[in-house]
Design a protein with these regions (language model features):
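Short "lid" loop at the C-terminus of a central beta-strand within the Rossmann-like core
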Residues: 37-38, 69-73
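A short glycine-rich, Lys/Arg-flanked "PGG" loop and its adjoining helix->strand segment in the class I
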Residues: 46-61
């Protein structure tokens, strides 16, 4: 699909944070992070320091889109806590048509921006009835991960889909 894009597209194969650090500040309108669906998650992409880097590289109206779909880990409170601490607005978008097949996973994204105008536009953009945006809230105990401290156990769903529990 990249070959068919009308825009200019450059692919960089490297550690995301190291490569992004070499890019000029305020050079991007959109950054997409899509690295959390699997069982091995790069937590260093969801830290205070990482969010500060993304903020420097995005334009004033830029959007950080984070694909957080995961069967066992709920990254929404983690990212929302980072956003709140860093002065970002965060919107949680999810496909409300959850698949019954355990092999499939509903799509869930967080959109972060520092622009109130952009946040309002995302929130009010008509989407399908299956897809809805709502404010992403960190909750009272959501941790702020840093380069020095992360713990995936803080992101565990209380009862992941498809995992048997005993009464």
């Amino acid at each position: 699909y990249l070959a068919d894009t009308a825009g200019r597209c450059r692919i960089v194969v490297d550690d995301a944070r190291l490569a992004l650090a070499r890019e000029p500040d305020q050079a991007f309108d959109l950054l997409i992070i899509d690295a959390f669906t699997g069982d091995s998650v790069p937590t260093h992409l969801l830290t205070r320091e990482a969010l500060a880097l993304y903020g420097r590289k995005l334009t004033a109206e830029g959007i950080l889109a984070v694909h957080i779909s995961n069967r066992y880990l709920d990254f929404a409170p983690i990212v929302a806590a980072l956003a709140a601490e860093g002065g970002w607005m965060a919107l949680d978008g999810a496909d409300r048509d959850v698949p019954e097949d355990f092999a499939r996973l509903a799509s869930r994204w967080l959109a972060l921006t520092r622009s109130l105008d952009i946040a309002k536009r995302i929130y009010s953009t008509p989407t399908s009835p299956r897809w809805q945006w709502q404010p992403a809230l960190p909750g009272p105990t959501a941790p702020v991960w840093t380069d020095d401290r992360t713990s995936v156990t803080e992101a565990l769903f209380p009862n992941p889909a498809g995992v048997a529990t005993t009464p």
